[in-house]
Amino acid sequence: PSTSAPAGVLNAVQNIMMRDRMGYTDAFGIPRLRQRIARHYHEQYGVDVSPDNVMVTTGSSGAFILSFLASFDVGDRVALTSPSYPAYRNILAALGIEVIDIPVDIEINFQPNVEVLSRAIETAEGKVDGLVIASPSNPTGTMLGPSELSDIVTYCHDQDIRLISDEIYHGITYERPAQTARAYGREMIVISSFSKYFS
């Protein structure tokens, strides 16, 4: 994340700027870019994604704001692991959405599982409308394994909980490749980021 943009990207931007080819793009992003992102999901994860289901935003923070606005109403309740990325909580609070904490610790690799998730939701006493997961996690760097991720996707589907999967750190893994939640279902929002993945 602290490196500069690749030379090829800088050169392409310079060429576009010099040719004065600036202007508005499609609201969901440049079609060729959306097609390439869909192809990336097929090449990297073996998952077929339609370019129609790809939206390009100005950074992942913009994606989180738009995803939360599209998925939740004022007064809805969204579960987050504790610890988790502080901006989730701040954005949700600004939108009038209640945060339900899911305590996680080293014993469960600082990641939720269905048992912990069920217990947190029961303790919350009432409907939980959403869940945000991050694998790899910020701040802990831990990842969900394929079976854990699959179980969470199934649980959210069965409980009618909107799942948002933060996958912006997929380009920074060490022991094993990260899995996308999209491999286990279609009814979620997956957020990724160029600045982390391709840095």
Predicted regions located by residue number:
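Hydrophobic residues in well-ordered beta-strands that form the structural core
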Residues: 80, 101, 163-165, 190-192
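Active-site phosphate-binding strand-loop segment of PLP-dependent enzymes
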Residues: 104-175
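A short helix-loop-beta submotif of the ANL/AMP-binding
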Residues: 94-100
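Conserved PLP-anchoring active-site segment centered on the Schiff-base-forming lysine
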Residues: 70-92
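Conserved active-site segment immediately N-terminal to the catalytic lysine
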Residues: 176-198
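A short helix->loop->beta-strand "cap" motif at the edges of active sites that frequently abuts
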Residues: 76, 97, 158-162, 186
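N-terminal small-domain helix-loop-helix segment of the aminotransferase-like
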Residues: 1-59, 66
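Short acidic capping loops at alpha-helix termini that bridge into adjacent secondary structure
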Residues: 48-54, 74-77, 186-187
